[in-house]
């Protein structure tokens, strides 16, 4: 039973898909130079332009009426070299890289500190970072660093030992078939609840095990090689035979898992059970043993996300030979720690997760992985340092004003909807007025006093960090929900909506150009951060978020007729995205990406309305030859400036609920009438949709 701090468990709906979480080894100096140069270019996009529009990326050979993304970003896409240690590169990634470098500066300032008192933040950051940077020590220890864990697995004599290991290893983030998480009860958000969810796959999605498309067949081949190589390097015999058995086991698990589309329905995923009901659902699983090892009281109520999975998984668990489960646990444990077990194991991990599945050419330099690991284990300690140096107080004040303007615009739009009844409108407005914004950084920081960091022992530090995070969650079980907590650190370039707390959250790092520029006029800011704000508010009213009310309670507040009308519009938008050919005949999954597409369309539409309201009837100035409306849409399109390796694009089409950036830019714009007026889009143009085919939801 593994505990993971995941967006899936906590129902956080982020603006941008996170990069694959995998530690990688050293990259070349050229990669760093390329990254730094591009970061500088992107960070300076608007600093010298009153309009806030970076025209250097424009492709003048493309008409904005035919392909708006390519017009705004085409030259940048053609001329920008992909950093060798990246699967994708664009606005988000460049700002993320800059944030990473800013954090590195902060970390390295304390990494040489002397005479530091034990237990202080400086000591913890210094010793954790330095232990990671000691590559020679990691290579010298190799798999021996986790030998005690492997010996404990080898000593297991029955399935009860397997269930116990699911929990004890799960505390360290080891992947197992039973996932546990602690978060607000979706029907009683002030109470913490225990969620039980399907888990346990190594490949990115069940499709990789069950479908025969080229990328999935290749994925299975990569899996077999990776598992074989891991076993061989760790000193196990017959690695290829073990790999075949594990692929068979994970395929059986994949067959009974819910699809990503099914997992979007939170009402079906809310299934409260006590221990007796769990035993009745899956009698083959010794739930009590697992929960005891996980330090969870067995008299708790458990919210089971996918009951049919556990019914079938119980049979798989009991029918699978014990030795296969021990191999599974051994492999998953080694794979979890492989990036920090020395050069050879790190290379195996990189070759599978990054090079094989995402097409990355070279491993990241060790300092990047070290910074990421410190961020993972004590992110809010670094966050405090980051905010002190890099966040401007005036940004918070201006963001708060924009958020209130977006909420006012949503109110106007909801009242004006011609397809929604007054009854549902009032419920929607009640929810809208209960949104809680969080901007920049937490009011209350995590207390890391109980986190022990030792000098020169990387594996112990990582285990301590993950155990600390696990214990913080367990401690919540007998306490009220603390809604001051954040799901992202201030140094994260992203934003999110949490439906159970009905909050929209904007970390400090996203409040910079091209999203938010204090030097630019309002048009580009409403097209950038304004649309981001609108996007996150829109998640409260997408096909998933609309199931929660203003207090974060999972309940149906829609009339049946209004719900049906919403679905008609949602399905029409999904059909549009289904028709976008992305790469090699592969298209977007419109239903899977539905929530993000609704967020984009609502965000852009409402941000435009808020921008027009901010003008208070005045005419916007023409700046750099662009009208205010044109600058608004140009600001929107330049936010999505991005490119990706083919393998990464294909992977994301399978696992990422966000559409590819180009289709986020174009897909929303073609449904907004003001875009047609701003750029004189007419029938026959590539960006033209007949009025009757344009979708308006909010």
Identify the residue ranges that each predicted region occupies.
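Hydrophobic/aromatic-rich, well-ordered segments within soluble, folded domains that form packed cores
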Residues: 58-78, 209, 213-232, 594, ...
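Intrinsically disordered, low-complexity linker/terminal regions across diverse proteins
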Residues: 42, 46, 252, 281-285, ...
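C-terminal motif of bacterial Sec signal peptides marking the signal peptidase cleavage site
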Residues: 14-17
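Noncatalytic, helix-rich "gating/capping" subdomain that lines the substrate-entry/channel surface
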Residues: 110-401, 405
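Active-site-surrounding "flap" and adjacent substrate/cofactor-binding loops of secreted or lumenal enzymes
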Residues: 46-49, 63-67, 71-137, 203
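Bacterial signal peptide processing site
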Residues: 19-21
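Post-signal peptide N-terminal segment of mature Sec-exported envelope proteins
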Residues: 25-48
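Bacterial N-terminal signal peptides that target proteins for export
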Residues: 1-6
